[in-house]
Amino acid sequence: MFDINLTHEQQQKAVEQIQELMAQGISSGEAIQIVAKALREIHKNDKKTPEN
């Protein structure tokens, strides 16, 4: 596993996404997994982008 540093705003958005998934009936653990996986994918793709 690797660490992803998120801004406060990004953390808030992640919490909101988790809460939305839970409101749709998804368990908290599964909601966290879904959001964490999405964040890892975004972070991985950001790392691949060449810096200017």
Swiss-Prot record:
It comes from the Bacteria. It holds the Pfam family UPF0181. InterPro entries: UPF0181 (IPR005371). Belongs to the UPF0181 family. This is UPF0181 protein HI_1434.2.
